[in-house]
Amino acid sequence: MNRLEGNVALITGGSRGIGAAVALRLAEEGADVVLTYEKSSERATEVVEQIKAGGRRALAIQADCAVPEALTAAVDEAAAMFGRLDILVNNAGVFLVGPLEDLGPAEVERTLAVNIRAPFAAAQAAVRHMGQGGRIISIGSNVAERAVFPGLALYSMSKTALVGMTKGLARELGPRGVTVNLVHPGPTDTDANPADGPNAETIAGFTAVGRYAEAAEIAATVAHLASADGGYITGASINVDGGFTA
């Protein structure tokens, strides 16, 4: 299936976990892919090589998403390298949690910079290169709707902010043919949150299906939203969480 043939996609934080799965899935669907990474250069290279082996073009760009200038430069470089930009996936994020009194200014600033300001800055930069059929998709979290453990206030706040951003951008960019959506993954088996981790059984128990998601399952929803099949979906927050929020 080549639903994304001829499209160029940029995935922030695309070297690992859900971001890497999204990069690989969009490439499988026919897109050329640019991904950003902060530190995982080896993993980023592995993803790029996998994409190239499948016959698509790919590029990895080092960028700290907390620095707006670096993120904007990455967006512009992606568009310049491949001649266009059709799809932006805001995936990069930080997960800083703990008791309220233990979260200092540094943790708050880092969370706001990466989880809120970066998606907004990336959208600002990307939309300059997008035409009819452009797609902006952000990766949120199920805890934007259901925070089942204490200590999640800062992270939950940052992901909830994406709901407002998504709705506002969808209304603004709809007349330009650009859709904007938000995907809220539930517990997903990644190196940061493995399905065999110490609290995994408890976390999986909060889902209706009793298990973690595979990263590829989250990527499948992103691919649908990025394709023409998702053209009438905009301003939506979609829970891909195994019934965690049911």
Language-model region placement:
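Conserved glycine-rich cofactor-binding loop
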Residues: S15-R16
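Short, small/polar-rich loop/turn modules that mediate ligand/substrate recognition or access, typified
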Residues: G174, T179, I233-G235
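Active-site helix of classical SDR
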Residues: A123, S158, T166
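Alpha-helical segment proximal to the catalytic Tyr-Lys
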Residues: R128, R171-E172, G231
